[in-house]
C-alpha cells in the first residue's frame, strides 16, 4: 500500500501544527476482535496514514491483533491504546483489566454502555440514542423521510471526506462504512495527539483524549468526548444510498447542537 505520492504535500503542510522531536517515538496499538470485522481495515488505514505522517515527525506506529479468546495472560503494558470490536460484556471486562489505558469502542452501540460512564472506554461509534435523535430531528423537517442514520457513508464528500473515501477504497477495494471510519478515527486522533504532545504513557493519553482532544475526523466539526466517553460528532442521514443531510439538523437542534444527539448523563 503506497500512500506516499498522494500525501507528501499534505504532510508537509501540517508539520507546523506538530512538534518534531530528535528521537523516534514508537507507539503501539492493539486490536481486540475478529479479523473479519470492518473496523480493522479502518485501523490499518489510520496506521498507514499515521506512519506516513510519522516519517516527518520521527514517530513510528505498530499494531498487534488478538481475538477476545486470547486476552488472558497477554501483556498489555506496551500499548498506548486498545482498539476493540467486541460486545458490551467483553468491552467492560477489558476496560476493567486496563483501567488506566484508553479502550476504544469501535462497534457496540449500546445505550447502557454510555450510561455506565466507564472512565477509560471511549466510544467512537455513535449510540443507538444518537442515531434515533438524529432521525427524530430530520422528521421535523421531512416527516415522510425513510432515511437511516450513519456515522459514515461512502458517498459523503464534504470536509475532505471524499479524499478519505478514495484512499480507503483504493487500498482495500471496499467502501468505507461506519465501523471502518471508527477504526480510522481512533488511530488518527491518538497519533495526532502523539504528534502534538509526545505522550508515551497510556494514562497520560487517556487524560488528554478525555479532556483536551479536538479532532476533525473529516466531518467538519471539532469533535471531543463527553464525560460518559461518547464522541460528539455529526450523524449522516442517508436515503437511497446517498447522504441527504447531517444531524444536528439546522433549525431543529438546540445549542449546543452536538449535544442534542444521544445520552449526556451517567446513571450514577
Explain the meaning of each model-derived region:
Residues 2-3, 8, 21-268:
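Extracytosolic ligand-binding ectodomains
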Residues 10-11, 15:
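Hydrophobic helical h-region of N-terminal Sec-dependent signal peptides
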Residues 17-19:
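N-terminal signal peptide c-region/cleavage motif recognized by signal peptidases
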